[in-house]
């Protein structure tokens, strides 16, 4: 059904700047880039901004930013269709002169009446070519009189057939097509006119786009031919569905690249996940580097069936990248989330009293990154290592305050930690267990409140690793703060939501049992 491409290509990604870059659009861009990278050629970025009412310059910038963030590199562009309006009008005049297009003076009211009549008959509306037979003299007179008109393409007779890279052989009968509009009454181009003119001028050889454009292709092929252009090879990707198996929408959660970026997903993970959402590289591996994906990519392994956007699977994949990326690659993506916590790596934090210690930051990241799912969670669990004070969950303070002997036990532990010659995890564990034994309590009676004191959470990595990384000064400061909170629990306790979201970051998720899309 499909075919392999082995020669250099010219592909394009052509979003409309009417909103944030959707994950479906990002996946289309990824497949175009992978094809270009795998066989050579050029990747063209084109902004289809001829819809004056809905297009937004800010969205044009945002789309470019989102593409760059996810790691997509284009070779040419961005080209703006709004800067090529004269070219579309010029090509429209050529079609009129060649008899491949004609002026239509039918009013919207007339067309609506015809559409209603067709609906009443239970038929799909096709423009009845009312104006096709007008002679040149009448057309000239009506144009001279200032009567509004559109320019319609004269569709050829017969079926339109083509081979789709994803779907195989396609056949559209003539009764499914009509003479569509090329230029509106204000001379602005429709999508059909601008996209075909651009693909010809930009020498596009392969058009890989969403299946929502499949019905446009039988219109575009004869237009390519009428304009003297080489018809590109087409491939139409299936839609991405939500968990309800309906078209992915806001009700399914974040659907734009920008939203997922803000939630703490890494670009490497999102690229990897979207690439596998409709493409099967073969084998069982799901974590693939960009180099590996380029080497493995082939359009004959693109799936024609819709893929379901599985947020759980994306979250798992993100956790794998959080665990494995070199810190030099990870830290630039983490910095904005540290800033949200009042901490700025390399420039000090809101209450850190100076620059963040790079060694402690690196150690804290290493300790926690295998236990979190997103950059947001990682920043939340790293923040206590650099804060002067933490907000403790009110229920934890209430529980600790109910134990009349706990404050004394913690105070004794605090003094022993302060006098330790070597502040290592082995020495810390030995000292805590010694204090517990001397005071006739179990070690757990000290471990749980100590963890809360230092992290604001009751879950996390091994406690003594945490204390060693945090260091003597910060650890003693947090123990002092918890002791102060126990003396005045009502005044010092904060709502549970004020602390780090440790419950969401306590354990790495297992990979869900689902296909690669």
PLM region spans:
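N-terminal Rossmann-like or analogous alpha/beta NTP/dinucleotide-binding catalytic cores
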Residues: 2-120, 216-229
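Glycine- and acidic
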Residues: 11-17, 45-49, 202-207, 255, ...
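General helical structural elements
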Residues: 16, 31, 119, 130-133, ...
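Residues that cap or initiate secondary-structure elements
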Residues: 17, 51, 157-159, 188, ...
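Short acidic, gly/pro-rich beta-turn/loop elements at beta-sheet edges
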Residues: 21, 55, 161-163, 244, ...
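Conserved nucleotide- and phosphate/pyrophosphate-binding catalytic cores
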Residues: 57, 61, 70-71, 80, ...
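Active-site cores that bind ATP or allylic diphosphates and position pyrophosphate for catalysis
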Residues: 103, 107-236, 242-248, 281
């Amino acid at each position: 059904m499909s075919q392999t491409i082995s020669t250099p290509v010219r592909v394009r990604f052509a979003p409309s700047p009417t909103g944030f870059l959707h994950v479906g659009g990002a996946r289309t861009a990824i497949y175009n880039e992978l094809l270009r990278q795998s066989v050579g050629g050029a990747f063209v970025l084109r902004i289809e901004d001829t819809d004056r009412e809905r297009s937004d310059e800010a969205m044009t910038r945002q789309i470019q930013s989102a593409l760059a963030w996810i790691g997509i590199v284009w070779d040419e562009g961005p080209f703006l269709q709004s800067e090529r309006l004269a070219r579309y009008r010029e090509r429209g005049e050529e079609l009129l002169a060649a008899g491949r297009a004609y002026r239509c003076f039918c009013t919207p009211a007339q067309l609506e009446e015809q559409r209603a009549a067709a609906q009443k008959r239970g038929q799909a509306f096709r423009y009845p070519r009312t104006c096709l037979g007008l002679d040149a003299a009448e057309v000239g007179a009506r144009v001279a009189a200032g009567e509004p008109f559109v320019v319609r393409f004269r569709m050829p007779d017969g079926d339109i057939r083509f081979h789709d890279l994803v779907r195989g052989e396609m056949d559209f009968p003539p009764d499914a097509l009509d003479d569509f509009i090329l230029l509106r009454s204000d001379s602005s181009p429709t999508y059909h006119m601008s996209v075909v003119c651009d693909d010809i001028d930009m020498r596009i050889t392969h058009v890989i786009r969403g299946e929502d454009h499949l019905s446009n292709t039988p219109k575009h092929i004869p237009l390519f031919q009428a304009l003297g252009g080489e018809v590109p090879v087409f491939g139409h990707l299936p839609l991405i569905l939500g968990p309800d198996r309906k078209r992915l929408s806001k009700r399914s959660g974040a659907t734009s690249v920008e939203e997922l970026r803000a939630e703490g997903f890494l670009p490497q993970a999102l690229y990897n996940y979207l690439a596998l959402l409709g493409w099967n590289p073969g084998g069982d591996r799901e974590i693939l580097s960009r180099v590996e994906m380029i080497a493995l990519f082939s359009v004959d392994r693109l799936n024609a069936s819709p893929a379901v956007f599985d947020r759980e699977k994306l979250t798992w994949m993100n956790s794998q990248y959080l665990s494995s990326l070199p810190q030099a690659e990870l830290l630039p993506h983490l910095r904005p989330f540290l800033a949200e916590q009042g901490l700025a790596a390399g420039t000090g934090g809101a209450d850190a009293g100076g620059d963040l210690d790079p060694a402690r930051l690196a150690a804290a990241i290493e300790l926690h990154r295998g236990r979190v799912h997103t950059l947001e969670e990682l920043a939340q669990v790293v923040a206590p290592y650099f804060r002067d004070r933490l907000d403790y969950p009110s229920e934890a303070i209430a529980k600790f305050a109910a134990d009349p002997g706990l404050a004394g036990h913690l105070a004794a532990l605090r003094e022993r930690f302060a006098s330790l010659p070597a502040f290592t995890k082995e020495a810390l564990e030995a000292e805590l267990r010694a204090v517990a034994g001397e005071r006739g309590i179990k070690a757990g009676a000290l471990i749980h409140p100590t963890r809360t004191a230092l992290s604001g959470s009751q879950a996390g990595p091994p406690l003594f690793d945490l204390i060693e990384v945090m260091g003597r000064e910060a650890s003693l400061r947090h123990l002092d703060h918890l002791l102060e909170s126990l003396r005045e629990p009502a005044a010092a306790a904060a709502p549970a939501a004020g602390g780090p979201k440790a419950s969401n970051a306590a354990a790495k998720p297992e990979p869900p049992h689902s296909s690669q899309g």
